[in-house]
């Protein structure tokens, strides 16, 4: 997720901007830049890479500027590069803009603006904004922004400066955070509170649809339409490290709570509720090519592999295409049978996982078409694939993956529906029901987070055990695999997941009095069979924690404790079911005093085989 900073006041702006960007580094970024207004012009410097790379060119900027904006970019549209870094300007260089979010209709706006003579220098969606504002400008920056913003479709936060009005910053929030800092003789703007803390503890959190005009005289807040609003000034007493985590004790907990937003970003621009269709313009397969596919190869490591297993079930169910699911570390050693009629799907949060890259190259050498599902624009997996389905989860700092998993699951759900629509195998009524369910999924993820207190209590009881078993069938088994991985990697409790039907084939020998068993039972057509397996474990003395859809009283009767998910289409449960499992692992780990964000012996991105 990009970082925005802005400053107007009595100090020199550039050191404040650079300090603010440094305090937002935890959000992750691939490039950075600043814009200053002074001497009747707008000055911009930006560079791919770290802030230290940007620092090497700041000598080109004039000293003494009191107004400026800055940005750290996490690439979405256009790979990391100097020209794709922010700030972006209009053709004349009068207006400079920094932006966090996604402009869904940027392609049509760009085409329109190019017809008007605007010259674009980048591949980004952001660049349409300064051109659009310039086309609306009549001598009043606020009025120009008010005219331009309603034409933008998507989620965004923007800050704008203009050489004609050098003592002004205009900012707008639309579904992406912005915070204003109120200092002594100065105003600050940022996408997150840490950037403000060295200068002020008095902040205004901008609400949805607000426009802020920052000048040396103060800040004026209205709606984009110009209606007055009543801002609330709050005092922030966080310590800097705590502030970077948004007030959460750990990045992992913060990222668990970011999942409603992350899921919404994954879905943005990819659903058409009116037609019940999924739109994946980034996948360049024609309907005829999809019909010609003989199989899909789903390959990944770790958490991404568990998301891939969900994808396997869904693609076979909805698109009727056989799917081979492999761990990337094993893929090359079995002489895989792939050809030009195979769609190879490589799933990787970082896009740099060594084993996944090696498997991708093996499949490509055998003629497969390659689709990457990743979170990082410009990553090696993204560059080497034919097509990329980005998850838009935003930077994930904790080693244990949370929001990356749930967004991968949703991205693969979209892919399964889309493939079924392209080859005609999916029932239109089911597709429509799934699209409707996906639209509600981000809000339901928020509802699922309300289980936190109850899950924490259960996790603290679990923390004293040496072994925990997870069981489930079909999609629930895929989630059980991810649940056991989360528990073992951050709490260091030995945990195993089994397909519930496999209990009699060995695992039942390990079930004795008091052993915790977490039973996932969210699939109505399999509920009776899973309940039978729950009964088998309880007969051996197991303590059973159950997870089911709301209203499932039958499952509750056979569990010692039950957690309910909001009711949804059964094929959409994995993205919700994983949330209480993540919380269970998190609170078990905190109860045991482990390093949650940086568990021993593990790394965020595994770039060696």
Swiss-Prot record:
The active site is at residues 2, 604. Catalyzes the first step in hexosamine metabolism, converting fructose-6P into glucosamine-6P using glutamine as a nitrogen source. GO terms for biological process: carbohydrate metabolic process; fructose 6-phosphate metabolic process; protein N-linked glycosylation; UDP-N-acetylglucosamine metabolic process. One of its GO terms (molecular function) is glutamine-fructose-6-phosphate transaminase (isomerizing) activity. This is Glutamine--fructose-6-phosphate aminotransferase [isomerizing]. Its main location: cytoplasm. Homodimer. Its EC number is 2.6.1.16. InterPro entries: GATase_2_dom, GFAT, GFAT_N, GlmS/AgaS_SIS, GlmS/FrlB_SIS, Ntn_hydrolases_N, SIS_dom, SIS_dom_sf. It is an enzyme of class 2 (transferase). It catalyses: D-fructose 6-phosphate + L-glutamine = D-glucosamine 6-phosphate + L-glutamate. The keyword Cytoplasm applies. Pfam families: GATase_6, SIS. It is found in: Cytoplasm. Residues 286-425, 458-599 form the SIS domain. GO terms for cellular component: cytosol. Residues 2-217 form the Glutamine amidotransferase type-2 domain. The keyword Transferase applies. Gene3D superfamilies: Glucose-6-phosphate isomerase like protein, domain 1, Glutamine Phosphoribosylpyrophosphate, subunit 1, domain 1. The lineage of its organism: Bacteria, Bacillati, Bacillota, Clostridia, Eubacteriales. CDD domains: GFAT, SIS_GlmS_GlmD_1, SIS_GlmS_GlmD_2. Keywords: Aminotransferase, Cytoplasm, Glutamine amidotransferase, Repeat, Transferase.
């Amino acid at each position: 997720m990009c970082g925005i900073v802005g400053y107007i006041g009595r100090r020199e702006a550039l050191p404040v901007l650079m300090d603010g960007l440094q305090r937002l580094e935890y959000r992750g970024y691939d490039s950075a830049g600043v814009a200053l207004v002074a001497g009747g012009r707008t000055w911009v410097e930006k560079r791919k890479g770290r802030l230290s790379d940007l620092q090497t060119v700041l000598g080109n900027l004039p000293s003494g500027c009191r107004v400026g904006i800055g940005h750290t970019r996490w690439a979405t549209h256009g790979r990391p590069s100097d020209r794709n870094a922010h700030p972006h300007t209009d053709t004349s260089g009068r207006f400079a803009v920094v932006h966090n979010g996604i402009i869904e209709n940027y392609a049509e706006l760009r085409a329109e603006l190019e017809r008007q003579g605007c010259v674009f220098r980048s591949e980004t969606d952001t660049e349409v904004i300064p051109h659009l504002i310039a086309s609306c400008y009549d001598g009043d920056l606020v009025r120009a922004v008010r005219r331009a913003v309603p034409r933008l479709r998507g989620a965004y936060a923007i800050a704008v400066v203009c050489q004609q009005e050098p003592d002004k910053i205009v900012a707008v929030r639309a579904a992406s955070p912005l915070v204003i800092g109120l200092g002594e003789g100065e105003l600050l703007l940022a996408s997150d509170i840490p950037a403000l803390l060295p200068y002020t503890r008095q902040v205004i959190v901008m609400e949805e649809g607000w426009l802020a005009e920052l000048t040396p005289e103060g800040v004026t807040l209205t709606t984009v339409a110009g209606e007055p609003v009543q801002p609330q000034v709050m005092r922030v007493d966080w310590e800097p490290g705590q502030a970077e985590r948004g007030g959460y004790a750990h990045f992992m907990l913060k990222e668990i709570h970011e999942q409603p937003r992350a899921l919404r970003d994954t879905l943005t621009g990819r659903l058409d509720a009116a037609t019940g269709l999924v739109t994946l313009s980034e996948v360049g397969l024609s309907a005829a090519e999809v019909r010609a596919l003989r199989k899909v190869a789903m390959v990944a490591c770790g958490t991404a592999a568990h998301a891939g297993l969900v994808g396997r079930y869904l693609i076979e169910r909805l698109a009727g295409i056989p799917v081979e699911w492999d761990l990337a570390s094993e893929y090359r050693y079995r002489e895989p049978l792939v050809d030009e009629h195979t769609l190879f799907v490589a799933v990787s949060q970082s896009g740099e996982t060594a084993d996944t890259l090696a498997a991708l190259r093996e499949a490509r050498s055998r003629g497969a078409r390659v689709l990457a599902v990743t979170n990082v624009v410009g990553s090696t997996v993204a560059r080497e694939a034919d097509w990329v389905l980005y998850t838009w989860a935003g930077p994930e700092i904790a080693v244990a993956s949370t929001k990356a998993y749930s967004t991968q699951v949703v991205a693969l759900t979209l892919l399964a529906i889309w493939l079924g629509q392209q080859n005609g195998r999916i029932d239109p009524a089911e597709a429509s029901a799934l699209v409707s369910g996906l639209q509600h999924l981000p809000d339901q993820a928020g509802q699922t987070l309300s289980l936190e207190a109850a899950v924490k209590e259960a996790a603290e009881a679990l923390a004293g055990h040496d072994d925990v078993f997870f069981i489930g069938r079909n999609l629930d088994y895929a989630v059980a695999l991810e649940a056991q991985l989360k528990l073992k990697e951050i709490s260091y409790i030995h945990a195993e997941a089994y397909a519930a039907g496999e209990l009699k084939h060995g695992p039942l020998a390990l079930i004795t009095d008091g052993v915790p068993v977490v039973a996932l039972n969210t699939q109505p057509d399999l509920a009776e069979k899973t309940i039978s397996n729950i009964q088998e474990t309880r007969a051996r003395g197991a303590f059973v924690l159950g997870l089911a859809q709301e209203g499932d009283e039958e499952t509750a009767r056979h569990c010692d404790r039950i957690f309910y998910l909001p009711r949804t289409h059964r094929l959409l449960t994995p993205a919700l079911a994983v949330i209480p499992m993540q919380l269970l692992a998190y609170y078990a780990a905190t109860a045991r005093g482990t390093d949650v964000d940086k568990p021993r012996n593990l790394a965020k991105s595994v770039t060696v085989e």
